[in-house]
């Protein structure tokens, strides 16, 4: 399954130890999505559409109310790059 360049970039950051945190409103709808790199920087290239695509492809998952992390399926989808850890 091919993934877009934006999805590839996000999965690459998550594979290096990043996380996606959500802020929800009172009706449990997503209000804000923030992608943090492993160094604590905020990556601004994640939007709701890309988040939903990655979730639909089961490349990211959250358990127990924790931030979203990359799954083993996501690791299979991400193409290897030299600076992956």
From Swiss-Prot:
InterPro entries for this protein: YjhX_toxin (IPR018654)
Q: HAMAP family this protein is in? A: UPF0386
* Family to which this protein belongs: Belongs to the UPF0386 family.
Q: What is this protein called?
A: UPF0386 protein Atu1321
* Native organism: Agrobacterium fabrum (strain C58 / ATCC 33970)
